[in-house]
Amino acid sequence: MAHSVKVYDTCIGCTQCVRACPCDVLEMVPWDGCKAKQIASAPRTEDCIGCKRCETACPTDFLSVRVYLGAETTRSMGLAY
């Protein structure tokens, strides 16, 4: 089952999640919404293995990058009954 990777606007552009990902799912893209002028993006979610190393590496109090595994994807989107 596919995993979804969500990057929130609390991202500070530190690149920790990008460096932690063993599957190269994440990359940094230009964004003017933070001091670093870049934000994490997840263009290759089909390669995500669900290890959540990106979450562990995130230094923000509110995890800026979240991985939702299988059924969690459905629940997080409010689609579960």
From Swiss-Prot:
Keywords: 4Fe-4S, Chloroplast, Electron transport, Iron, Iron-sulfur, Membrane, Metal-binding, Oxidoreductase, Photosynthesis, Photosystem I, Plastid, Repeat, Thylakoid, Transport. [4Fe-4S] cluster 2 binds at C21, C48, C51, C54. It catalyses: reduced [plastocyanin] + hnu + oxidized [2Fe-2S]-[ferredoxin] = oxidized [plastocyanin] + reduced [2Fe-2S]-[ferredoxin]. [4Fe-4S] cluster 1 binds at C11, C14, C17, C58. The keyword Membrane applies. Binds 2 [4Fe-4S] clusters. Cluster 2 is most probably the spectroscopically characterized electron acceptor FA and cluster 1 is most probably FB. Residues 2-31, 39-68 form the 4Fe-4S ferredoxin-type domain. Its cofactor is [4Fe-4S] cluster. GO terms for cellular component: chloroplast thylakoid membrane; photosystem I. Its EC number is 1.97.1.12. It is a peripheral membrane protein. It is an enzyme of class 1 (oxidoreductase). Its main location: plastid. It is found in: Plastid, Chloroplast thylakoid membrane. GO terms for biological process: photosynthetic electron transport in photosystem I. It holds the Pfam family Fer4_7. NCBIfam families: PS_I_psaC. HAMAP family: PSI_PsaC. The eukaryotic PSI reaction center is composed of at least 11 subunits. Apoprotein for the two 4Fe-4S centers FA and FB of photosystem I (PSI); essential for photochemical activity. FB is the terminal electron acceptor of PSI, donating electrons to ferredoxin. The C-terminus interacts with PsaA/B/D and helps assemble the protein into the PSI complex. Required for binding of PsaD and PsaE to PSI. PSI is a plastocyanin/cytochrome c6-ferredoxin oxidoreductase, converting photonic excitation into a charge separation, which transfers an electron from the donor P700 chlorophyll pair to the spectroscopically characterized acceptors A0, A1, FX, FA and FB in turn. This is Photosystem I iron-sulfur center. It comes from Porphyra purpurea. The gene is psaC.
